[in-house]
Amino acid sequence: MTAPDVRPRWPQGREGCMALAFDLDGPTGDAMLNGTIWQKPEYFTFGGYGPFRALGRLLDMLEQYDVPATFFIPAWVVEQWPRQCAAIVEKGHEVAYHGYRHESFYTLSGDQQRQVMEKSRKIFWQHLGIRAGGFRTPSGDWHPETPGVLLEAGVTYSSSMRGDDRPYAISVPGYQQPLVEIPGKWEMDDYASLAYTREPDFPKGLDRSASYALTLDNWCREFDGAMDEGLCLTTLFHPKISGKPGRILLLEQFLAHMKQRDVWFARCQEVADWYLQEQQHD
């Protein structure tokens, strides 16, 4: 007996979906939340390099290869670098929520999460004129109340969990429309292979950067495996990590490899909208 085909029916009959995504964290995160970053100018500039210097390089690359992307941005970064963040929208890419200062949502109560989302919504509207429809949880996990908080804030999709290789629905009591999840995987996080800081030790235990050639090979294998099965792949790349001169060449090679296949390159919001439409038809 043949197993049922679980491949999604991608637009235009494409063989798979690639939702390229970047987390424009800047210097936000644990060191900012606990205050130690203000005693570590080097670490602050390590993060600030992302929106200040690397972002423009990435936008030029995406334009060259004609690939859309989604940028998940802590609202504090939008406040500090509004012109750079506005350039993302002007270039036709998507911007989405990523906390205010990259808070760990699994440590916050429902009310605290609502405060973060409301602040983020106001800042995105004030500086970008955008009501974002997407969210990626900082820290890679969330509180049981988070899906409801997101729907309450007008969010239609998340790219936070790891439960599938395809978009799926998260039903929330009291809401007719589910929250769409576009799952990622740590293998497609550039921190896992390319991040390095001496102090603070982050990621902990990582004492050197991986070979660029091996990193590219890993990414290409993950992409090819996903496309061979007709799945959806997204990335957790960071401009401050991958947007440096030597590493942008790595990303260019990855984009060139992906462009060889007949896949749907989509913003995450487009993937979520497609999923909701397909779900209505099934």
What do the PLM-derived regions correspond to, one by one?
Residues M1-G134, S139-E187, A213-T235, G243-D282:
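Catalytic alpha-helical scaffold of carbohydrate-active enzymes acting on polysaccharides/glycoconjugates
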Residues E181-L206:
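Glycine-rich, positively charged active-site loop/lid region within alpha/beta enzyme cores that binds
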